[in-house]
Regions:
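Short loop/turn and low-complexity linker motifs enriched in small/turn-promoting residues
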Residues: 1-171
Length: 171
């Protein structure tokens, strides 16, 4: 049987109860991010629901969502969207790390957290300088020149990134 509202060739409107709320993403202060985005997923699932730009608000169905901010380092949040409410996720203003190396080589940047190191970025081994937009925190650069074959030539440099500032990291 056909419902009265299902007429071929005519725009049909089907009413469904779909309570919604909004997710607003913001960066504190002036941002050096050109196009910061986050991945929005339903809570506990890995399938991407949306990729949302910062400084925007988007409507979502009521429920729990996991958010992964594509910053250095990655930031993860869990939000509970409620009907007719706006949830705001605000992250700190980033800083800049200007990495200057004496030679080409292999280097990684780690986040220093709870006396542990977490890999957050691998440097371009074909370049001697790189500028990175990073979240405030304590970091460590570990670098081995390309010409060195032994680990004894590995160098380390700890550095701190603060909101709105530029930090030079030389090795």
């Amino acid at each position: 049987t056909r419902r009265a509202s299902d007429i071929p060739g005519v725009h049909n409107i089907i009413v469904a109860d779909a309570p919604q709320g909004q997710l607003s993403l913001k960066v504190q202060g002036r941002s050096d991010y050109k196009s910061l985005q986050c991945i929005v997923r339903q809570h506990g699932k890995m399938k991407t629901l949306n990729v949302q730009d910062f400084n925007t608000s988007v409507k979502y169905l009521v429920g729990k969502y996991d958010i992964e901010v594509l910053s250095l380092p990655r930031l993860n949040f869990s939000v509970d969207i409620k009907q007719s409410h706006t949830n705001t996720v605000e992250i700190p203003q980033p800083g800049l790390a200007n990495v200057l190396l004496a030679s080409k080589g292999h280097g990684d940047i780690f986040l220093e957290k709870d006396n542990k190191l977490e890999l957050i970025h691998t440097l371009n081994h074909l370049s001697t300088r790189e500028t990175l937009v990073m979240q405030p925190g304590k970091y460590r650069l570990i670098f081995k020149p390309q010409s060195s074959r032994e680990s004894i030539y590995t160098q380390e440099r700890s550095f701190k990134i603060s909101s709105g500032t530029s930090t030079q990291v030389r090795l």
